[in-house]
């Protein structure tokens, strides 16, 4: 049986990317709502209920409305908004998070696709907290830079409309109340919200997230090699992982660490740097904010859910 897939919000940034990734596939049938009917709740309900799997690429409130329009027990959902990421009954769509997560996604009725900003720090921190190398109440700070596509259509139009006058970068989220904090705290196994400082750069897509660690106040200070080993061991045990861990090495800089390096892929590459004498470490993730951070993750989750249908 060919699975029917409906992308609710297929004309937005993430929706367009998902459709492009699925366009040549013959194992699925893509349902497409006429443009003039895409904001009609009755039309959306028709397509949502006809789908085997619906992928929601909508703002939070619109995503909640779409879920409410599903009137059967068979349509499964992948939601790319923040609406359900820490909600009971929704599997978190980061298959590499735990050995059992791929199976949980494959069997789930409802899957919450991860946000681009939390996914890198979660990938870096969760193995360390699970291994007991970092306490859950460790004061975590997260820095990073993303392409302007991370702000959706309005930011894309604003940046590209300014041409040469567009800023090279700018910080945002200066109220320190980023919408991804609950998700980050929950899945990184943290006991408190981290301090998160995102930056937008003058490039379309790709991102780097960084977690600096001041380790000197811990009762037992882990060495850099220990941090790296815990992260590497975690992902070595995940079948089909899209997360790579770079070798542990002492380098001043690397041409690999470039935000656009993994654009149009679903790859995330993790790095650990350390100065043991100073009891400091830097954790770093490089990935595509529209790939592993959005559409690539959605397709990865879709494939897992399809495996549960076969």
Swiss-Prot record:
Active site: 116
Metabolic or biological pathway: Amino-acid biosynthesis; L-arginine biosynthesis; N(2)-acetyl-L-ornithine from L-glutamate: step 3/4
Gene Ontology BP, a term: L-arginine biosynthetic process
Enzyme class: oxidoreductase
EC annotation from Swiss-Prot or TrEMBL: 1.2.1.38
Cellular localisation: Cytoplasm
SMART domains: Semialdhyde_dh
Keyword Cytoplasm: yes
Record bears the keyword Amino-acid biosynthesis: yes
Xref: InterPro entries: AGPR_type-2 (IPR010136), NAD(P)-bd_dom_sf (IPR036291), NAGSA_dehydrogenase (IPR050085), Semialdehyde_DH_NAD-bd (IPR000534)
A GO term from the CC aspect: cytoplasm
One GO MF term: N-acetyl-gamma-glutamyl-phosphate reductase activity
Keywords: Amino-acid biosynthesis, Arginine biosynthesis, Cytoplasm, NADP, Oxidoreductase
Catalytic activity: N-acetyl-L-glutamate 5-semialdehyde + phosphate + NADP(+) = N-acetyl-L-glutamyl 5-phosphate + NADPH + H(+)
Pfam families per UniProt: Semialdhyde_dh, Semialdhyde_dhC_1
Family, per entry: Belongs to the NAGSA dehydrogenase family. Type 2 subfamily.
Role played: Catalyzes the NADPH-dependent reduction of N-acetyl-5-glutamyl phosphate to yield N-acetyl-L-glutamate 5-semialdehyde.
NCBIfam families in the record: argC_other
Listed name of the protein: N-acetyl-gamma-glutamyl-phosphate reductase
Species of the source: Chelativorans sp. (strain BNC1)
């Amino acid at each position: 049986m060919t699975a029917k897939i409906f992308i609710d919000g297929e004309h937005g940034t993430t929706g367009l990317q998902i459709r492009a990734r699925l366009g040549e596939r013959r194992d699925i049938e893509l349902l497409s709502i006429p443009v003039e009917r895409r904001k009609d709740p009755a039309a959306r309900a028709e397509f949502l209920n006809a789908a085997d799997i619906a992928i929601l690429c909508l703002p939070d409130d619109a995503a909640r409305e779409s879920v409410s329009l599903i009137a059967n027990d068979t349509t499964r959902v992948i939601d790319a908004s923040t609406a359900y990421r820490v909600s009971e009954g929704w599997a978190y769509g980061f298959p590499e998070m735990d050995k059992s997560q791929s199976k949980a996604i494959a069997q789930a009725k409802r899957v919450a696709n991860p946000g681009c900003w939390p996914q890198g720090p979660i990938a870096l921190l969760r193995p360390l907290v699970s291994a007991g190398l970092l306490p859950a109440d460790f004061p975590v700070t997260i820095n990073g830079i993303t392409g302007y596509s991370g702000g959706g259509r309005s930011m894309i139009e604003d940046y590209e409309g300014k041409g040469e006058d567009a800023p090279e970068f700018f910080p945002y989220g200066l109220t320190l109340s980023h919408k991804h904090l609950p998700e980050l705290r929950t899945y990184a196994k943290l006991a408190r919200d981290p301090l998160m400082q995102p930056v937008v750069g003058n490039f379309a897509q790709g991102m780097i997230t960084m977690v600096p660690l001041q380790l000197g106040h811990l009762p037992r200070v882990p060495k850099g090699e220990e941090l790296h080993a815990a992260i590497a061991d975690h992902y070595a045990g995940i079948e089909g992982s899209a997360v790579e861990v770079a070798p542990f090495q002492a380098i001043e800089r690397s041409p690999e660490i470039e935000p656009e390096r993994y654009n149009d892929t679903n790859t995330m590459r993790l790095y650990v740097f350390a100065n043991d004498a100073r009891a400091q470490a830097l954790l770093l993730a490089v990935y595509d904010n529209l790939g592993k951070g959005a559409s690539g993750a959605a397709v990865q989750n879709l494939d897992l859910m399809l495996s549960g249908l076969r």
